[in-house]
UniProtKB/Swiss-Prot annotation:
GO terms for molecular function: D-ribose pyranase activity; intramolecular lyase activity; intramolecular transferase activity; monosaccharide binding. Pfam families: RbsD_FucU. Coiled coil: none annotated. PANTHER family: D-RIBOSE PYRANASE. This is D-ribose pyranase. The gene is rbsD. Pathway: Carbohydrate metabolism; D-ribose degradation; D-ribose 5-phosphate from beta-D-ribopyranose: step 1/2. Its EC number is 5.4.99.62. Keywords: Carbohydrate metabolism, Cytoplasm, Isomerase.
Length: 131
């Protein structure tokens, strides 16, 4: 049994398989998940687990080069945006329209669905390298 890092076997396998620039999405419970993209559904009820809880665990276990967010989060969910910026200090940040964000999710290795039910609580994590 693992002692550290991500314990969820599906998430751990996805993170272990990532190459440089591959992407993983952490999403609220409302983001549409495109056909053909691996869905890892963690939602058990509204708000659980939260977007920020899942982001923290995944970010602690992943080399992240860049972060993509929907620009709408800045106004419509400023608190979550601030927390993302606080938790993820190193990577570059990119803001795109929500429609562009949804297009980008079609290329993700996986989308991790949380129980979060606040607007635009979604992030695309772009894998970096560990050296």
């Amino acid at each position: 049994m693992k002692k550290h890092g991500v314990l969820n076997s599906e998430i751990a396998a996805v993170l272990a398989s990532l190459g440089h620039t591959d992407t993983v999405v952490i999403a609220d419970c409302g983001l549409p998940i495109p056909d053909g993209v691996k869905r890892i559904d963690l939602a058990v009820e509204i708000g659980k687990p939260s977007f920020l809880e899942v982001l923290q665990v995944v970010a602690d276990d992943m080399a992240i080069e860049k972060v993509t967010l929907a620009e709408e989060v800045i106004i419509n969910n400023a608190e979550v945006n601030k927390e993302i910026e606080r938790k993820l200090i190193e990577p570059a940040f990119e803001y795109v329209s929500h429609e562009q964000f949804k297009e980008h999710t079609k290329k993700a290795k996986a989308i991790i669905r949380t129980g979060e039910a606040t607007p635009y609580a979604n992030v695309i994590l772009h894998a970096g390298v560990i050296f």
